[in-house]
Amino acid sequence: MVKKKTNNDKGKEVKENEGKLDIDSESSPHERENDKKKTEDDSLRATESEETNTHNANPNETVRADKFSQEESRPIEDSPHTDKNTAQESCQPSSAEDNVINTDITSLNEKTSTNDEQEKGLPLKISEGPFTISTLLDNVPSDLIYTCCEAYENHIFLGTTTGDLLHYFELERGNYMLVSQTKFDAESNSKIDKILLLPKVEGALILCDNELVLFILPEFAPRPNTTRLKGISDVVICNFSRSSKAYRIYAFHAEGVRLLKISADSLVLTKAFNFKLIDKACAHEETLMVSKLNSYELINLKSSQVIPLFRISETDEDLEPIITSFNEQSEFLVCSGGGSYDSGAMALVVNHHGDIIKGTIVLKNYPRNVIVEFPYIIAESAFQSVDIYSALPSEKSQLLQSITTSGSDLKISKSDNVFTNTNNSEEFKEKIFNKLRLEPLTHSDNKFRIERERAFVEESYEEKTSLIVYNNLGIHLLVPTPMVLRFTSCEESEIDNIEDQLKKLAKKDLTKFEHIEAKYLMSLLLFLMTLHYDHIEDEVMKKWCDFSDKVDIRILFYMFGWKVYSEIWCFHGLINIVERLKSLKLTNKCENILKMLLMMKNELKKKNKTGLLTNDFDDIMKTIDITLFKLRLEKKETITVDMFERESYDEIIREINLHDDKLPRIELLIEIYKEKGEYLKALNLLREAGDYISLVSFIEENLKKLPEDYIKERIADDLLLTLKQGDENTEECAIKKVLKILDMACINKNDFLNKIPAEETSLKVSFIEQLGVQNSNDSKFLFNYYLAKLREIINQSNIWSILGDFIKEYKDDFAYDKTDITNFIHIKLKHSLQCENFSKYYEKCENLKSENEKDDEFINFTFDEISKIDKEHILTLLFFPNELTNWVSSEELLKIYLSFNDFRSVEKYIGKQNLVAVMKQYLDISSLNYSVELVTNLLQRNFELLDDTDIQLKILETIPSVFPVQTISELLLKVLIKYQEKKEESNLRKCLLKNQISISDELSRNFDSQG
């Protein structure tokens, strides 16, 4: 916790009285005032009650522990407590209250006295601490030594060292009768090791002498026809399945872990795990903390991972392993000790990864059993005592309390049952009721409500516990001391103590009485933070807001002296500290009141959305609203409507109209008019201010709420005016909004487009871009505009020179497989900042061309227009890389691509008629190496053209004598082979033809001779 400490002068007045506050005294200022009225008779009271019926709650209404009852609005100014001098006089401490320490000592004596009274007639002695003891059952057989104790509904079950099982039943509240006393095994006196209740299947597992038997509840007798499991060292619950209505149980055997499934009518072995020699265990689903051969281990049954940990005893002394759950999700608590039970020990919290967390808790002796009742650890000593330690490593002294006995060893147990303590005295309960009843801070004669609040505390009061301390002298409840009696100091150190306690309460399900106590602690925490912190506008105010659903935040307004609407109530035990805080000048603790109020407002609005706040939310908000508005108006700071509630609007408008600065507050006024449904007034304000962007946004957001006459007659003019007043940065957004509004208002967009003046070319282009092209004329209009922009950019940005550099770079690259010239220029343009604007409009033209690719007229139009500004065919190549044949001959295209050294594109136009010519041009390249590579690639990639003898000979003739033949020897060989194959094929054909003619002549002669 961060506490800001300063010594500035403005906090001096606050500091003077800090040490003089006490929480509780004999009577509150309101009680002292009401003493004057004690002589009034009952009939007058009844009359007053009827007269104040607006303050009385419905008698049939259910009173909830977590919600304050609400009263009719009553300003503080009407209360006698608003007189500051009177309040200060009533808050002056008496001589007995000169410092807070006296209060603490008195409280401590009261606690000790309470414990002393409890010890009378009890066989236990308990030191001062967070728990008290209360006898549950004192007539157990004293000749037995008990090993375990469990409770189920109205039944108590005991196990002993001699194998006895005792069953007690509660006949009436606090009166138990021994129902049965039987032996686990009639032939054995072995001790009962464990009673594990399975309440959801009305069963219990009894472990005795390594034998596990399933009992039925509440009869507490063995279930018939159920297998007895032998060789079991320990048994723990894995979980309960709601679907199968069965418990999954781990039973630990020397030969491994058995997974049992126990339902109301069966016990089934479902699985076995090969983890042997486990003595004791605790389970979190598939994660086990186990003891084995004087050491602890973590086992994950799902992954079969084993994490060895540390030894149970530093020596080979046979100490019983201590394993329990620190919390039910991810942490275990184990103990490690020295050589014996009387030597010191450590309690260690270990997570599922085997890491020791939360520090080390030092125990004075090695325990026989440990229960975690966070934030306490209750240890069963081997020396007839139970020791209670703090589970918080920050505690200076971790040993908080001890319980001793004159009987046999004390045992501890945490039962499934929750018991209610009924043994406290009326004086003790009266003290609690007096502290926790609510009393009005603003003066009220609502005596019925006051009595009802006290009755509510009395009805809610209960002390519950599931902790049991027992031995042969009886069974006793270990009861936590009521929190309201444990926190009585006004010292600053109490803040941390209360915060720790509230964190603990947040982790458990609270009873109705615990809810009341929690609210009391929250109130006390807020008052102490307000008292001791030098600056309260941040952390303290945030805490007030966090607790606003439990503590009436109007108490804070009361302490600041602000006007408070409706009646506010506070715990009687805290009235004095509230009144004395009110006498201090708390504004000295705030550096920025505005910031504080705004933070509170925002936090409370969030809370209100969850439905957690009271019905007085509107009264709380109104107090803050007007204060915030006036302070901000004085400082000329920004004011927004989300700072105010609807009830404050009219007053805020009046405040603004009192000043001449209405227009600077236009946003606030517009938002207020919107909330009030006066939309045309808001439009007029925006029009007068010339804020057309906000105007169109307002129309879009509120179109359905605007009058029909405005939409028919005025809306188009406002929208057009908005577009004409916009700039390039806001134009696109404005047009989108206008188009959306036109759709919403069912206004024809072309009609609106025709209203745009001819001189507003740029606006018309932007509108068509957003609207989308409707016809060919729109396309031509846009293309001419884009092309004009391109021409302008080319001239202004020296684009031809830049493109020339790109082309030179491309031509100087003689790699045959390089990309084509069009793609190369695209890439260069994309990465050139100088060409960014050129690329922008090029893409617009290209997109427009693509959208109209099936419109031949438009495509021809674009080619003609681009050709007018083109140089060296660069633009036509960019725009029409695949369509140029529509306007340019193949021969011309070949020349164009050859001029750029675009070798791949050249191939598209190569044939037998020009192959040799292209080859000659490649040979003319100055570098022989490049020429060789180009010619080689040319011939290889066009080998299919070399099927003619003439062209083969021309190729061979064209190759110069200086040409390194070895580089194309393979290619030449293929040419020669192809030539030879063709020659041989020709000769073969001639020979075959000659033979065929000869055969034909022979057949003809034979035919003639026969005829």
From Swiss-Prot:
Primary location group = cytoplasm
- What are the record keywords, sorted? Cytoplasm
Question: Is Lipid metabolism tagged as a keyword?
Answer: no
Amino acid composition bias (Polar residues), ranges on this chain: 87-100
Q: Which subcellular locations apply to this protein?
A: Cytoplasm
A GO biological process of this protein is: regulation of vacuole fusion, non-autophagic
Q: What else is known?
A: Present with 2270 molecules/cell in log phase SD medium.
Supply the name of the protein.
Answer: Vacuolar protein sorting-associated protein 3
